[in-house]
C-alpha cells in the first residue's frame, strides 16, 4: 500500500522538521500541529539560511499555501 503524504507528516509530530517555503525561506522546529491544508505549527522555530540560524521565533504558524516541502530532520 502506498504511503500518503499526511501519514509522513503525522509521524513527524513532536519531532524536528525542516519546512521549506516557496520564496526560499527555511524554518526548522518541532512540529506540534498541522491540518489538511498543510498549515503547520512549529515550536522552537528558527529561520535558517545556508545552514545557519538567522532568527529564533519560538512558536509560529506557517500558512500551507507557502509550504513547498516538509522534511523530517535527521535524529
Swiss-Prot record:
NCBIfam families found in the cross-reference section: PRK00737.1
Family statement: Belongs to the snRNP Sm proteins family.
Protein name in the entry: Putative snRNP Sm-like protein
Entry keyword annotation includes Ribonucleoprotein: yes
Entry keyword set: Ribonucleoprotein
Keyword Ribonucleoprotein: yes
HAMAP family recorded: Lsm_RuxX
Domain Sm as annotated: residue spans: 4-75
UniProt-listed InterPro entries: Lsm6/sSmF, LSM_dom_sf, Sm, Sm_dom_euk/arc, snRNP_Sm-like_arc
CDD domains: archaeal_Sm1
GO terms under cellular component: ribonucleoprotein complex; Sm-like protein family complex
Biological source species: Pyrococcus horikoshii (strain ATCC 700860 / DSM 12428 / JCM 9974 / NBRC 100139 / OT-3)
Amino acid at each position: 500500500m502506498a504511503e500518503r503524504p499526511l501519514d509522513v507528516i503525522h509521524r513527524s509530530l513532536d519531532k524536528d522538521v525542516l519546512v521549506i517555503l516557496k520564496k526560499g525561506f527555511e524554518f526548522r522546529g518541532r512540529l506540534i500541529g498541522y491540518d489538511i491544508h498543510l498549515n503547520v505549527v512549529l515550536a522552537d522555530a528558527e529561520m535558517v539560511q545556508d545552514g545557519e540560524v538567522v532568527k529564533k521565533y519560538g512558536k509560529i504558524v506557517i500558512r500551507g499555501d507557502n509550504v513547498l516541502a516538509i522534511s523530517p530532520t535527521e535524529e
